[in-house]
Structure formats: structure tokens, C-alpha cells
């Protein structure tokens, strides 16, 4: 959402930007929207909680990962399977959508003693054979998305997964080097690919969650986020 509002984690010189108006607009809009129309307990809901709400017909709109499409369209698990539509994340009029790029990837540690076995597993788990195996057991709509380009040309998958083309379009449209409206020094759409982000991202997320829960104001949350980001960037040597 912040990208579509033109917000940045840092400017070109790694100066934190939570004190800028774009972040105020983003967080205020989010908090107001969720308080007015979001589910109860939204500040503590994660993927599984929101998935359950959507499948039960208690959440009218859910913006999340493309992998969730197969879950919400499965009539065995979802009460709204025949009522679900799919759309790209919104554009706030500045030329950037609020979508992101994320993947659960398979990697082989350089120091492993069983690299050959690991490589065989990775090759198998991303192979056409595995895709066909999952399809035979769980149905074409439930095969792992985003692992093989050929999947999106498969007529059986296209028929079973009405979200297939939109998923591929979303993947192709993601641009980790230009995530928001203004230039940034980092790579990453919904995260910043630097070591400091793991801790900083958690801190900022908790601050924003507290604002949604009514434990702090939007202004206070942004000030604390700015302070935390400034401290992290100073300690990391990005700024003085």
C-alpha cells in the first residue's frame, strides 16, 4: 500500500522517510479503513486468520499472495468459492500498484555435505513431474504457482485456475528495483534487501499494528518508526 501512496523506506541517501507526508497518508488511510470496515482483531490477524475469515464469507476483500487464490476457490474449503473474483492490487493514481513480490525459495547452503541430494530434491520439487503429481492428487488448481513458466501455458491449469493469467501478469509486472514512485537506493518491493531490515521491519510492523489496535496514534507510530530507522541506519553506517 505504501508504494502506491508514493512512500519510501529511505531516500537516495538512506535517510529514513517515515516523517514524510506520504507515510502519514498511507498509515492514516490504512488505520481508518480497517477500523471502519475491517474484521475484529485485525491488528493481530495473519495469513491464516484472514484466510479463514475469507473462506467463511466474513471478509469481503483480501489483498494477499497469489498462492491464496487456490485456497479461496476450493469448494471443499471455501464457502465463497463460486463467488470469488480476482484483481490486481489497487493503484492510487501515482503509477504504482500496491502489489508485492515474494517467494518461498529453495536454496542449498554452500557448506552442506549433501549438496548432490539437495540438488536432486530441488530439481524434483520444481519439475514438471512434480507439478503433474500434485495435479493428480490435489487437482490442477492446487499445484504450486510461480515455479514453472510452462504451467501458465497448460490448458488444464488455465481451465482449473481462473486466476492463472492474472498471477503471471502480476509476477511479470513486479519491479524490485523500482518499487515506489520516487527513486530508492534499495532493492525490494515490500522489503528492503539489507541485513538491518529483519529487525527494523519487525519493529515498524509492531508500531503500525499498535496504531491499528488504538494503543498509539498514527503520528506517534510514525515518529517511533522514524527514530528506530534512523538508529538502525546510523548503527549500520548508512548515515551519520
Model-derived features with residue positions:
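Short amphipathic alpha-helical coupling segments at ligand-binding clamshell hinges
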Residues: 22-29, 113-125, 220-224
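Short hydrophobic/charged patches on amphipathic alpha-helices used for structural packing
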Residues: 48-51, 55
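Alpha-to-beta junction loops
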Residues: 56-65
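C-terminal lobe and pocket-closing loops
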Residues: 67-81, 92-202, 240
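Solvent-exposed, amphipathic alpha-helical segments
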Residues: 199-214
Amino acid at each position: 500500500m505504501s508504494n502506491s501512496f508514493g512512500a519510501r523506506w529511505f531516500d537516495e541517501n538512506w535517510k529514513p522517510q517515515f516523517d514524510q507526508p506520504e507515510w502519514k497518508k498511507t498509515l492514516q488511510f490504512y488505520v481508518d479503513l480497517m477500523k471502519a470496515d475491517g474484521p475484529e482483531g485485525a491488528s493481530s490477524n495473519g495469513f491464516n486468520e484472514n484466510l479463514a475469515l475469507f473462506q467463511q464469507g466474513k471478509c469481503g476483500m483480501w489483498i494477499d499472495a497469489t498462492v491464496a487464490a487456490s485456497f479461496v476457490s476450493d469448494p471443499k474449503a471455501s464457502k465463497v468459492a463460486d463467488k470469488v473474483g480476482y484483481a490486481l492490487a489497487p493503484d492510487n493514481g501515482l503509477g504504482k500498484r500496491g502489489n508485492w513480490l515474494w517467494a518461498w525459495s529453495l536454496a542449498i547452503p554452500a557448506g552442506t555435505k549433501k549438496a548432490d541430494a539437495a540438488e536432486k530434491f530441488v530439481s524434483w520439487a520444481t519439475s514438471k513431474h512434480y507439478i503433474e503429481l500434485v495435479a493428480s492428487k490435489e487437482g490442477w488448481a492446487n499445484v504450486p504457482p510461480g515455479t514453472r513458466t510452462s504451467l501458465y501455458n497448460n490448458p488444464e491449469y488455465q481451465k482449473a485456475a481462473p486466476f492463472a493469467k492474472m498471477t503471471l501478469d502480476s509476477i511479470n509486472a513486479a519491479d524490485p528495483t523500482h518499487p515506489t514512485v520516487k527513486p530508492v537506493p534499495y532493492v525490494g518491493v515490500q522489503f528492503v534487501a539489507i541485513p538491518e531490515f529483519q529487525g527494523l521491519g519487525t519493529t515498524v510492523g509492531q508500531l503500525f499494528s499498535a496504531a491499528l489496535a488504538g494503543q498509539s496514534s498514527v503520528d506517534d507510530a510514525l515518529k517511533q518508526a522514524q527514530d528506530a530507522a534512523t538508529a538502525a541506519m546510523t548503527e549500520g553506517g548508512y548515515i551519520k
